[in-house]
Structure formats: C-alpha cells, structure tokens
From Swiss-Prot:
It is found in: Cytoplasm. The gene is pepE. Keywords: Cytoplasm, Dipeptidase, Hydrolase, Protease, Serine protease. One of its GO terms (cellular component) is cytoplasm. Hydrolyzes dipeptides containing N-terminal aspartate residues. May play a role in allowing the cell to use peptide aspartate to spare carbon otherwise required for the synthesis of the aspartate family of amino acids. InterPro entries: Class_I_gatase-like, Peptidase_S51, Peptidase_S51_dipeptidase-E. It holds the Pfam family Peptidase_S51. This is Peptidase E. It catalyses: Dipeptidase E catalyzes the hydrolysis of dipeptides Asp-|-Xaa. It does not act on peptides with N-terminal Glu, Asn or Gln, nor does it cleave isoaspartyl peptides.
Length: 234
C-alpha cells in the first residue's frame, strides 16, 4: 500500500523546526519505532549534508528512530535500499531533483514507496512527489535531466501556497502564476498546500491535515476546496 505524508512546510507560524508535524508523524510512524529513516538532504543549498542531517535528527528525536542521510552510503541508493522509511527534506526543488537523478535514486524511491515503504517530505520533499516540479516556487534554478519528478502522486503540487498579494508587491500572485501554468498545461491539476497543511496519501485516497484547507486548481483556474479532515480520491 502506498503510504505518504506530504507536508507543505517545516514550520508553521512561530513553531520550531518540524514541531507542528509532531502529532502527524507520531501517528504516521507509530509502527516504526526503532526502525531506520533514510533521509535525503539534497535540497538544503545553504547547509552541508551533515548539518541538515543533524537538524532533522534533533527535530525528530521524539520518534525514537534512526535517521541516516543517504550521503553516508558508498552509493547513496544503498541507504535507501536498506531503510524502513524514506524522508526528503525541503529547500531547493531544482537542486533536489538534479541530485536524485545524478545518484540514480528516482527508480529505487519510486519502487520502494509503491511497495509500502512509508514516505514523508516537506516543502521541496512534497513537491518532488508529484508529476513534475514545474509548479515549484524556487530559485536558484539548476537544470536536472528532466523536470519529471517521482510521479508517486499523478498531479502537480504547489507547497507554501499563499493566496492574494502582499501589500506593495507588484509581481504576480501565486494564483496568477498557477493560472499561467494551466494555460500552458491545460490538462494538469495543481494541488496547492497552504502553510501548516499536509496530505496523507494512502493508495488512491488522500486526507487533508492541518490548519487550512487544500485547494485544487484546474483549467481556467476552476478551484476545488478540500477541508481539514476531508478524505477524497484523486
């Protein structure tokens, strides 16, 4: 059974790093105490892999699990193959996907998650689960071999979604950017995850968690809303 927890962000309002995810992760990983999480740190542009690993280990110590970054493996995929759970951290989605391709991790992650290995990721780690990374918010832009992502979720994901424009901002709003994407890709669906929200995906069903409803945009910016604790098929 496919079992994934996709988190919009690592923080919500004034909470600490991954603090708001605590109850979700405790429930999500209730049967995995003492097991190993393979952590993928590639999105962390402004910190070393060791620093990112330590940050996540400290934040998730309450899970009582062994968190090991893939960069410790002679081949990074070795850590993925041996792990009980897979996690991908947030940061820059372009850098993340580029290195997933470079280290030959796309297929092994896809295979393991499709065969019941739990997966969780935040921000870029949620974005990369979708069909492609073409609805990321990120800079700098690096060029992976393809913008096609893990495709464990068949639609587009836009984390950190904020509706409307901030005062004094004269650029495009998030809705306007997504509308442009849907003009170019009219058959796509974009699931927008506001801050503090998450999707728990089990096979072909998804449940909304968190503080804010999740939005689904389609051609002509038709918008569906999925309220907190709603379960829907995708």
């Amino acid at each position: 059974m496919k079992n994934m927890l996709l988190l919009s962000s690592s923080k919500y309002k004034n909470t600490g790093y991954l603090e708001h995810t605590l109850p979700w992760l405790q429930n999500f990983l209730a049967d995995y105490r003492g097991k190993t999480i393979a952590f993928v740190p590639y999105a962390g542009v402004r910190r070393t892999f060791d620093e990112y690993e330590k940050t996540v280990q400290n934040a998730l110590s309450y899970l009582e699990m062994n968190i090991v970054s893939v960069h410790h493996g002679k081949q990074h995929r070795d850590i993925i193959e041996q792990a009980d759970v897979i996690a991908i951290g947030g940061g820059n989605t372009f850098c993340l996907l580029k290195q997933l391709y470079e280290h030959n991790l796309i297929d092994i992650i896809r295979e393991k998650v499709n065969n019941s290995t739990p997966y969780f990721g935040w921000s870029a780690g949620a974005n990369v689960v979708g069909a492609s990374i073409m609805t990321t918010n990120d800079m700098p832009i690096t060029y992976p071999p393809s913008f096609q992502a893990l495709q464990l979720f068949p639609h587009q994901i836009n984390p950190h979604f904020i509706s409307g424009k901030m005062q004094g901002h004269n650029g495009e709003s998030r809705e306007e950017r997504l509308a442009e994407f849907l003009l170019v890709n009219p058959t796509a669906l974009v699931y927008a995850l506001p801050e503090g929200s998450a999707l728990h995906i089990q096979n072909e069903m998804a449940t909304v968690l968190g503080e804010n409803p999740i939005l689904c945009f389609s051609e002509n910016m038709e918008c569906g809303t999925f309220d907190i604790n709603t379960t829907f098929s995708y």
